[in-house]
Curated annotation (Swiss-Prot):
Keyword list, A-Z: Chylomicron, Lipid degradation, Lipid metabolism, Lipid transport, Secreted, Signal, Transport, VLDL
Gene field: APOC3
Protein name: Apolipoprotein C-III
Biological process, per Gene Ontology: cholesterol efflux; cholesterol homeostasis; chylomicron remnant clearance; G protein-coupled receptor signaling pathway; high-density lipoprotein particle remodeling; lipoprotein metabolic process; negative regulation of cholesterol import; negative regulation of fatty acid biosynthetic process
GO molecular function annotations of the record: high-density lipoprotein particle receptor binding; lipase inhibitor activity; phospholipid binding
Predominant place of localization: secreted
Length: 96
């Protein structure tokens, strides 16, 4: 009779350990999900602050000004050399 009681007690201990491990796994998964959510929020906040920062706005202004200057330069260049690109020979008078 004692071996049966010992066997039942051992099985109960194993079941209790299995439930504890399963509870830990669920808890660990929840902690990881919370960590990922917090990291995502932190990254989004950092990106927002960078976008709104004075340095970023100044850099955007420099890029916009540079692109505008480049467009102006290109239109001036194109205007000066358009005669070369649109060259159509004048018809020569026929000598008949």
């Amino acid at each position: 009779m004692q071996p049966r009681v010992l066997l039942v007690a051992g099985l109960l201990v194993l079941l209790a350990c299995a439930q504890a491990i399963e509870a830990e796994d669920t808890s660990l998964l929840d902690k990881m999900q919370d960590y990922v959510k917090q990291a995502t929020r932190t990254a989004q906040d950092a990106l927002t602050s960078v976008k709104e920062s004075e340095v970023a706005q100044q850099a955007r202004g420099w890029v916009t000004d540079s692109i505008s200057s480049l467009k102006d330069y290109w239109s001036t260049f194109k205007g000066k050399f358009t005669d070369f690109w649109d060259y159509t020979p004048k018809p020569e008078p026929s000598s008949s």
